[in-house]
Amino acid sequence: MISNKIAILLAVLVVAVACAQARVALKHRSVQALPRFLPRPKYDVGHRIVGGFEIDVSETPYQVSLQYFNSHRCGGSVLNSKWILTAAHCTVNLQPSSLAVRLGSSRHASGGTVVRVARVLEHPNYDDSTIDYDFSLMELESELTFSDVVQPVSLPDQDEAVEDGTMTIVSGWGNTQSAAESNAILRAANVPTVNQKECTIAYSSSGGITDRMLCAGYKRGGKDACQGDSGGPLVVDGKLVGVVSWGFGCAMPGYPGVYARVAVVRDWVRENSGA
C-alpha cells in the first residue's frame, strides 16, 4: 500500500517537472523569433555589425560598450558627462554594480576609459513582452572628461519626425554573420529609415510595431544591426534618433531593423538626466 502511494507521488512529481520544462521551452521558443535582444546570461550576445565597415571611435565618439562583468553586452550613447542611454532589455533585472561602460576606444575589450554604472533607470512603461519603450538611462559613478573620442550625442526635439528614406548610421560591436570579419573593432552601417506602415506589415505576424519604434534597413537586406549591437545608436546628421532594439534575424530581406524612437521620450530623458 505504501509502495503504491510512493509510486503515485513519484509519477505526479515527474509529470509536474515535465510540464514546467515544457513551459520554459515554450517561453524560450517564443523569443527566438527576435534573437537580437535575447538577454544574457541565459543566451550569448554576439559581437558584430552585419554588412558594415570598420570605423574609428572618433567618427562616433558618443558610442560606448556596455560591459556586464567586464564583457561586452550591448551598445550605448553618451548623453552628457554623467548619463548614458541604452536599451531597457540590456539592463532589466541586472544590478548596477555588475555594469560598466567603456568609452573612447574602437575596441570593446581594451583601451579607452572604463567607468562603473551607479544607477539604472529603465523607462517606467517598458514592456518586456513587446519590447515597447525600450529605453534605459544609466548614471555613471564619475563624470566623463570629453575629448576627440568621447563626446555627447545631440538629441531630437520631443516628437520630432524622421522622414522616410532618411539615411542613418548605426554602429556597434554586434554580429557580422561573417567569419572573415573581426569582432574586435567598432563597425558601422548606413541604412535608410523605413515607412512606419510598411514596417508594421513586415512584422504583422509578431504583432507589428508601436509608435515608440522606428525601422531602418533595405528591402533586400544585407545591412543591419545584430546581436551585441542592442542599445547602440542610430544617428542622423549627428542626432540620436534611435536605439538598437530588435528585429527578425539580422539583415534578412523584408525585415528591417527595429529601433526605439528617441524623440518620443525626449522629455523623459531631459527630466531624468538633464540632457
From Swiss-Prot:
Keywords: Digestion, Disulfide bond, Hydrolase, Protease, Secreted, Serine protease, Signal, Zymogen. Pfam families: Trypsin. One of its GO terms (cellular component) is extracellular region. Residues 49-274 form the Peptidase S1 domain. The active site is at H89, D134, S230. It comes from the Eukaryota. Expressed in the midgut. Expression levels drop a few hours after blood feeding and pick up again 28 hours later. Belongs to the peptidase S1 family. This is Trypsin-3. The gene is TRYP3.
